[in-house]
Every structure is written in C-alpha cells, then in structure tokens.
Amino acid sequence: MEGIIVINKPKGITSFDVIRKLKKFLKTKKIGHTGTLDPLAIGVMLVCVGKATKLASDLEAKDKVYIADFDIGYATDTYDIEGKKIAENIIEVSKENLEQSLKKFIGNIKQVPPMYSAIKIDGNKLYHLARKGIEVERPERDITIEYINLLDFKDNKAKIETKVSKGCYIRSLIYDIGQDLGTYATMTALQRKQVGEYSLENSYSLEQIEEMTLNNNFKFLKTIEEIFSYDKYNLQTEKEFILYKNGNTVKIKENLENKKYRIYFQDEFIGLANIENNNLLKGYKYY
C-alpha cells in the first residue's frame, strides 16, 4: 500500500495520534506526516504511506493557507490560548491600526520560532527545554508571507487568513503582530485550510478513513501523479536510467524549462529531479 492521504485533523489530538490511528486502520507501519499540527489546530494534514514517505520533504515544502483567531492584549508562554498567561497590556486597537500592522508582515521576512516547538537546538527539542523553564536564543528563520487578510475584528478579537511558506509559525506571527501594535497577541484558534493545491474539500476525516478501509475502499489514497503537479519527463535510455538512479547528472537532448519534474522510465515513476541549464537533469528524490 502506498500513496498520500489528505486528512482533516480534528481538534484535541496530536499529529502523532493521527499517524497512530492510521497505522491501525491501514495495518501498515510505514506512515509519516508532512508538517505538524498542534492539538489546538484543525484542518489539512498530508500523510504519506509506504514508498511515498520518501517524498515527504517535497510535500512539506508546499505553501500553506491558514485561518487564525487571536486576542489582542495578553501573551502566554506558548503564544496560544492553551498556555499560561505571562503578560497583559490592554490597549484600544482600531481596525485601521491592525490592518496597517498586518501589511508590515507581508513578503520575505525574518521570524523567531516559539520556544514551544519541535525545533532542535544543540540536540534538544525546544519544547522540552521550555517545559523545564529554560529559554534559549533561537536563530531567525527566513519565511515568506504571500498575504494576510483581516476577516473579522471586534473588541480586540481578530480573525485572519494568511498564505505562508514552509517554516512559518502562525503563533509567532500573531505574537509579533501584537508586539508591533505595542502590546501582546495570543492565538485562540487555528485551521489549516490548504497545503499546496490540496484543501479541506479534498480531505477525509479519520472516521471516514476507518469506515472506508473496513469496506476495502481505498480511494482516499492519492497517487504520486495526483499529488505532484510537476511536469512529466521520461528518461529515454537504459544509460540515462542508470545514471539517474546512481545520483549522477543526466545530460538530456531536449531543452527544457529549469524547474522540477516527475521522472519516469518505461512509463514507471522513479523519482523527482531538477532541470538546470535547460538540459542537465539532477535527481533529488528517488522512488
């Protein structure tokens, strides 16, 4: 069994809980997700099954769309509503002030990840240190925010929709917005609406997956071809195939656009590659 599942994660369980349940339903151990959702968060979670786990990093790199709610005026240690309140500064914020602040975060920016995260520093996961009351300096990360739309705002409670790159923490974005406003802000709800081209409309609940597997219905498993929208390229000869599989650069006869491609040999999918200089094929994921 192999492929990719678009899960609609419910609130109150971890991403690992989702994987554990799927292993039980599908009776397979080779399953992995492509981006953690906190227990508070709901929404789209891409899960790789079987050989598809080799391609997880490419899926993780896709842009994501979130809808987030937050309160302005206080901070917690986790930057979300489930943490301990550590600071408060109630000020009146107008819709115009908030909209001006949001504009400052659009584009290529630097972001410091939260202490309560799975990022490792010197071999230690940050959330393990945070639970011991230890705070360490975290290096800034380069992220991109394509847009932030203010959906609702009343009485210092806001709802936004935003499209972000890999590595962006919405909790940190909201905290930073609060800082820019001269106060604090804390995330109260989060929904991942979309990962790449896959949205809630394409997703399945865990209950649906369980019922479908009991009926031997596996249509929820998407193929690699369905998930990756990269153009297809067929290697022409056995020599090209061997060079590719051994990790060597393949010089092809055609002039192609410099971008990522799905690579096939004898109509069988064998991995992903970048085209450079229009005719140099360099594999980076092998299936």
Curated annotation (Swiss-Prot):
Protein EC: 5.4.99.25
Annotated SUPFAM superfamilies: Pseudouridine synthase
Keywords, comma-separated and alphabetical: Isomerase, tRNA processing
Tree of life domain: Bacteria
GO molecular function: pseudouridine synthase activity; RNA binding; tRNA pseudouridine(55) synthase activity
Catalyses which reaction(s): uridine(55) in tRNA = pseudouridine(55) in tRNA
Keyword tRNA processing carried by entry: yes
Biological-process GO terms, alphabetical: mRNA pseudouridine synthesis; tRNA modification; tRNA pseudouridine synthesis
Active site positions, chain numbering: 38 (nucleophile)
InterPro entries: PsdUridine_synth_cat_dom_sf (IPR020103), PsdUridine_synth_N (IPR002501), tRNA_psdUridine_synth_TruB (IPR014780), TruB_C (IPR032819)
Signal peptide region: none
Stated role: Responsible for synthesis of pseudouridine from uracil-55 in the psi GC loop of transfer RNAs.
Record-stated family: Belongs to the pseudouridine synthase TruB family. Type 1 subfamily.
PANTHER family, A to Z: PSEUDOURIDYLATE SYNTHASE TRUB1, TRNA-PSEUDOURIDINE SYNTHASE
Name of this chain's protein: tRNA pseudouridine synthase B
Species of the source: Fusobacterium nucleatum subsp. nucleatum (strain ATCC 25586 / DSM 15643 / BCRC 10681 / CIP 101130 / JCM 8532 / KCTC 2640 / LMG 13131 / VPI 4355)
Taxonomic lineage from the root: Bacteria, Fusobacteriati, Fusobacteriota, Fusobacteriia, Fusobacteriales
